[in-house]
Design a protein with these regions (language model features):
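Charge-lined substrate channels and their catalytic hotspots, especially those that engage the 3′ end
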Residues: 1-286, 293-339, 370, 377-378, ...
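Electropositive polyanion-binding surfaces
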Residues: 22-25, 160-164, 169-173, 182, ...
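A short, compositionally biased micro-patch
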Residues: 51, 75, 85, 278, ...
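Acidic/polar residues at beta-strand termini and the immediately following turn/coil
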Residues: 51, 84, 157, 350, ...
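Short, flexible surface segments
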Residues: 103, 176-177, 624, 629, ...
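Intrinsically disordered, low-complexity linker and terminal regions at domain boundaries
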Residues: 105, 125, 653-699, 711-717
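A generic structural signal for residues embedded in beta-strands
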Residues: 109, 183, 635, 687-689
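Short beta-strand-to-coil "C-cap" segments at the C-terminal boundary of structured domains/repeats
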Residues: 204, 702-709
Length: 780
């Protein structure tokens, strides 16, 4: 019907709906309703448009108009950017040119103004068509509203990039205003109505429920904890233990001294190791991974759901697993003293850390001990009580530590980069309220297991690459020269000597930079800046190596319980072992799986960051008014981001500084025009917590003059345009909290109320100034 409508409009130009219905023979009541639905859909896709008099026309572009297709990234203040595939620079879209596009929409644009590299201005574009809406569901608390009696009320969403209200149709159930709802978008904002219209899909919970804030974030990203009934039914059919038949044809390693090393609270123990010295002076290392693919067969309900999720999601107070607990905490968990099916990479490693021989095969193991990182670290530190308790495996642990040193040294020599940035764990009570933020400590045990997982992943990837079979790789491409240049410029401002240009700088040169700043107050910040200059690792059917690890071959083999690519690798190991004829099948499915897994990983990271920001802001609400020593973590044109020792980061907006400040983009500094006070990344300063907003995840600080301040006289030539200025508006006063010896509270009874922050002011989409919590080991 759509083609007939288009042909008719093309011929007639402008027609009424009734004329169109008669021409198409759709003027009967049932056919007319079908026509109206089709027209509504075509209007949403910008294929037709309704004129002010109600008539219809084709929504055509101007002749000879060059258009581009891209993804729109909205800013909460109304403007946005459009990213084009394969292009480094984004197009700026002004508030009046957004044309009702929503963050994430696929859009068509025309160029209004070309970029001016001399002035440093971006190209400007206008959105002329929305090709596909990204937002189909929204989660938030219902606000009952009688202003529009046709609707039950509107949704209060955490998504700050949605500027228009979302009105909800009256559902069959009675609402009291405490419900957190998941709604489906029926109508998007347009010239006719500047708001969304949505229908209730589900009641996620109530505002008084414990942990509802985290659940709201997860549900808004379609990260769902509950598994479909068919998936749970399949999981229940999996036995509690492998049978003798299951073990047929497997290498039996149950007599090897094998054990797991994990965090104390880990339940899904999916990797175990064994080690022994060989007569020729080399070391045999066995990395044994739960054979999840034996139970999750291709095409099953379990497999389809695992691919849909593609990864487990780890947030502050919960895990949303890729697989049901029946598997992950049951038969696929390598618990001590029980038989378990595994896939193993058994490697002979020489004194230089090179794998000189290996076997990749299906095995059966029985772990001797369930070790924790703290236990292993204590043993290596000489704890006699622990060494006595685990005397059977102390020699193995000591040999593992020795091998780890060899492997780590090997990676460093070949150019692997190490980003040792602080990571924090947010501790919450039973109601989900944050009670403390503690730094994570990575000891020898944690780094040792990471070394073993890395070498196993490399060995498996190299094996299949050399067989020239279709395979899935974990790739990390070289960083863009533009981003590396910014890092070089900044590192040079500390007096560091840089060897090589941005397009040619070696990994060894980057290593030298990081070694040169070890122990300096700005070392962590510089490490984070280097990390931000890197591209994001992803999955691909093509092997492009792993820049961060300086590895020619890399994949993910070691965590099939929580990552789908690892599950696929296990499946390929088994299937290729039987016949190479399955190559054509894998060649077809791998690209889609790689894309899905990369996208789901990015979604998981976004969820983790959003929850972390929310919980950190909630934690800091109690400390508004307190003063702390902090470190400048990032400087931008509109202010400076400052990090506390517990990794909490906040913004000091330039309008809240006491004078004009010049921004030097090359050196990333802000310098006071009169006082000469200069802020640099890595510099220690004194701050006061002014505002913490759980809803937005934003934290505002103010600058307190102190003995840390650096004064640099003789300011040269920054233009007036880069200067910050005091706000001319009078600011409200409010009482500070009571003083506390422990918290070093300000002695003042009154303090300024901070202005609402303007984060990412005219910044490109995707710029991140806060630290995201990494997965730690096994996440590269």
């Amino acid at each position: 019907m759509k083609d007939r409508i288009k042909e008719y409009l093309k011929e007639k130009g402008r027609v009424t709906v009734n004329d169109l219905a008669q021409a198409l023979g759709k003027d009967g009541s049932k056919d007319f309703r079908e026509l109206i639905k089709t027209l509504s859909l075509m209007e949403r896709k910008h294929q037709i448009r309704f004129e002010e008099d109600g008539s219809l026309t084709l929504d055509q572009k101007k002749k000879h108009e060059i258009t581009l297709k891209g993804t729109f990234h909205a800013h909460k203040n109304g403007f946005g950017f459009v990213s084009l595939e394969g292009e480094e620079d984004d197009l700026f879209v002004g508030k009046n040119d957004v044309n009702y596009a929503i963050d994430g929409d696929t859009v068509e644009v025309v160029i209004k103004k070309v970029a001016d590299r001399n002035k440093g201005t971006a190209a400007e574009a206008k959105i002329i068509d929305i090709l596909e809406h990204s937002l189909t569901t929204v989660v938030g608390q219902i606000v009952l509203d009688e202003e529009k009696p046709k609707y039950a009320g509107y949704i209060r969403s955490k998504n700050q990039k949605i500027s228009q209200p979302i009105y909800v149709k009256k559902p069959a159930i009675q609402l009291d205003g405490t419900e957190v709802l998941k709604v489906f978008i029926d109508k998007y904002p347009s010239k006719k109505h500047d708001f969304f219209v949505a229908s209730v899909l589900d009641v996620v919970g109530h505002s008084t429920d414990a942990g509802i804030d985290v659940l709201e974030v997860l549900e808004s990203m379609d990260i769902v904890s509950e598994f479909p009934e068919a998936v749970l039914k399949e999981a229940e059919s999996v036995p509690d233990a492998p049978s003798e038949k299951d073990m047929e044809g497997r290498l039996d390693l149950r007599d090897e001294i094998t054990f797991t090393i994990d965090g104390a609270d880990a339940k899904d123990l999916d990797d175990a190791v064994h080690i022994k010295p060989l007569k020729n002076g080399n070391i045999e290392l066995g990395v044994h991974i739960a054979d999840v693919s034996y139970y999750v067969t291709e095409g099953s309900a379990l497999d389809k759901e695992a691919l849909n999720r593609a990864t487990s999601v780890y947030v502050t107070d919960r895990v949303v697993p890729m697989l049901p607990e029946r598997l992950s905490n049951g038969i696929c968990s390598l618990n001590p003293q029980v038989d378990r099916l595994t896939q193993s990479a058994i490697m002979e490693i020489n004194k230089q850390g090179r794998v000189v021989n290996y076997t990749i095969t299906q095995t059966v193991i029985k772990t001797s001990f369930r070790m924790t990182y703290s236990d292993v670290n204590d043993i290596l530190a000489g704890d006699e009580e622990k060494r006595q308790d685990y005397k059977k495996i102390v020699p193995s642990i000591e040999l593992m530590a020795k091998l780890h040193e060899t492997l780590e040294s090997m990676r460093i020599k070949r150019g692997a980069l190490s980003f040792d940035t602080n990571e924090a764990k947010i501790l919450v009570d039973k109601k989900g309220k944050p009670v403390d933020i503690v730094l994570r400590h990575r000891g020898v045990a944690e780094r040792m297991i990471e070394s073993f997982m890395l070498i196993a992943n490399e060995t498996v990837a190299e094996h299949f690459s050399k067989l020239d079979l279709p395979f899935i790789y974990r790739i990390h491409e070289e960083p863009k020269a533009e981003k590396v240049q910014k890092f070089i410029d900044y590192a040079s401002s500390f007096g560091l000597r840089i060897y090589g240009t941005a397009s040619e700088i070696s990994q060894e040169a980057l290593q030298d930079i990081m070694r040169a700043v070890e122990g300096e107050p700005y070392a962590d910040v510089l490490s984070m800046m280097l990390l931000r200059s890197m591209q994001q690792a992803r999955y691909s059917e093509h092997n492009h190596g792993h820049y961060d690890l300086a590895a020619d071959y890399y994949t993910h083999f070691t965590s099939p319980i929580r990552r789908y690519p690892d599950l696929l690798v296990h499946r390929m190991i088994r299937d290729y072992g039987r016949s190479k004829e399955v190559a054509e099948h894998f060649e077809q499915v791998i690209p889609e799986i790689a894309t899905q897994s990369s996208n789901r990983e990015r979604r998981a990271i976004e969820a983790e960051r959003e929850v972390e920001a929310m919980k950190k802001a909630e934690y800091m609400e109690e400390f508004v008014g307190e003063e702390y020593d902090a470190v400048v973590s990032s400087i931008v044109k509109f202010g400076l981001f400052v990090e506390l020792p517990n990794t909490v980061e906040g913004l000091i907006h330039i309008t809240n500084l006491p004078e004009f400040y010049h921004f030097n983009e090359r050196d990333l500094t802000l310098r006071g025009e009169k006082s000469g006070i200069t802020f640099r990344v890595g510099q220690q300063i004194r701050i006061r917590v002014e505002r913490a907003d759980k809803m937005t995840g934003e934290i505002d600080f103010s600058f307190i003059p102190s003995e840390f301040d650096v004064i640099e006289k003789g300011l040269k030539g920054s233009g007036r345009k880069d200067r910050g200025r005091r706000s001319d508006k009078k600011e409200d006063k409010r009482k500070a909290g009571h003083s506390s010896d422990k918290r070093k509270h300000s002695s003042k009874d009154k303090k300024k109320k901070s202005k609402k922050p303007f984060y990412k002011e005219v910044a490109k989409k995707g710029a991140k100034h806060g630290k995201g919590r990494g997965k730690g080991r096994r996440a590269k």
